[in-house]
Amino acid sequence: LPEDFSYHFDVIENIKKQFGKDIVLLIDTCLCSITPDGHCGVTNHKTINLKDTHYSLGVAANTYLEAGADIIAPSDMMKNTTKYLKKTIGINGFIDAPIMSYSSKFKSNLYGPFREAAKSSPKGFDRSSYQLPVNDRERAIKSSINNAAQGADYLMVKPGMTSIDLIADIKSNTLLPTGVYQVSGEYASMTLLNKEKLGNYINLLHESLLVFKRAKADFIITYGARDIVSHL
């Protein structure tokens, strides 16, 4: 089972020591970059072992918080992860630690660049058993509602641009801050358009962020954060 997160502890602790309260650390809490088959949970015979997955995610979450993380962000999309983490971090003294759930995360073809960089492309079977089908609006909204009921403090749709139609309904049903994740494929498409002189990267990025705000996203996660800040 993945249960040694000492490397993550050292990185988080050193960042907080250097920047202190000038930085807020939201730590993606998942297993895909450390499991042998690239899945977001522990697998046995091409199926997810939910008990072992929750255990490892709990160890990770508590390790991150002990190191100084401000918010944990489970992105695994397994059943009842938010509920499990809320309980286990509470037992370890982090009852007030916020959880930002990747609550409406779709099985998408737009994650390719990240998976290549993290070497986390799934092997053996795909992620359709736990990530959402892109055509099921009702299930996606229900997923966020369920995560809110389990104790999530922040909700999210992912990928960003292909999910903006869900934000308003999720917010009205949960009354929780709901954001978007502009994923690696979205980001790469803008940089490639710029490279081929078919569009200006900064203009494309700015336009996409304005669309997220128009859709009432409360926060935006993007690989272009530092780029857009330098142009504001």
PLM feature spans:
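Alpha/beta enzyme core
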Residues: 1-232
